[in-house]
């Protein structure tokens, strides 16, 4: 089912297969040594016999990720925030480095090198996929381990679909996810909180900051509050605030992609 031909200083493995539509095709793969060609010949013949042969595909990592986002964002009804964050991660942290690589040619070693590159990459190196000119100070602020872990999580999910779509046999990611360095956050004490409130002159901002401190509300929860969420006539006479909704910044493109109507 497969044969080896010497072509100049290399060896080619020639075989026949059927594409996704059942159309007969011919495949050629070149190798530097005869041993490599023989090993590939054995593998191809085995895969053609047991049905595990992967139809050669030129899809790149960038094409895979855009296809995955398009399908999954609709299927799972992503929020505008999730969509925007995923697109930004693909544009700025993945495509500039491995976006042009063919999915079927990507190996675990390539991903390991990619993660190592990200660990040395400054924050904001790419914006909307365009490389930025950074100051010396900006270059010193590197991507966090959390950001690299998020890239790993996104790739793991996307490549799992590549396996389902018969593009690859297995996910080409390292067995262990990138380690996250947990940094303890600095929390304001009561003195700092009071000093901040005394500094703020804008009444609306003062109220928002006060509520975030006293009630531990997030920015989106505070901005989402309406008069109907306030009850000044509670039974205990203290009044209540009901947090029933949240507000978030949404990219116009995300809204149009998720709800074209």
Task: Tell where the protein language model's regions lie, with residue ranges.
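N-terminal helical hairpins
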Residues: 29-58, 71-79, 92-93
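Glycine-rich, flexible loop segments associated with nucleotide phosphate handling
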Residues: 24-31, 82, 131-151, 238-248, ...
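Short, Arg/Lys-rich segments that mark the N-terminal edge of DNA/RNA- and chromatin-recognition modules
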Residues: 1-30, 240, 245, 251-254
